[in-house]
Amino acid sequence: MCHKKADTGDQFGKWQSSPHAKAYEVLATPEAKAAGAKVGVAEPQKSGKCLKCHSTAYNFTEEVKADVTKVLVEDGVSCESCHGPGKNYKSKAIMEDQKKCIEGGMIYPATTSCTQCHNEQSPTWKADRYTTKDGKKVGFDVEQAAAKIAHPNPKAQK
């Protein structure tokens, strides 16, 4: 798998150590259970209210699930959540060509991808979590958040 190689950026390793990879696990913590209780959820790891943002696989349609057999609810927020199912762009020949990737369904996430979950509806939302460059306190800043999960390939695409 190319996404595990250091010379191409070790995207898998970066994801594995990220909060996204641990998004499902965190639902078992006392903090998550307390947050869930505030919105009427007794078991966060079993509730769609929580899983819709804490697990990519939870959101797959049956059609997509048939194509993506290796993605589990327990995987947390995985690649497909931000980049779309990789079935049609996962080959090396396509991955090396950005235009072909996009034609195959690869998504290069925009702010709206992030704010589907990072928003005021989250029970752990903090309106002052980030400080913008101009000193304003905001609940989410895509530039800072993206920097925390950046996983570029040092080998530039065509």
Where are these regions (language model features)?
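Repeat-solenoid scaffold signature
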Residues: 106-121
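Sequence context of c-type cytochrome heme-c attachment sites
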Residues: 1-75, 80, 86-109, 128-158
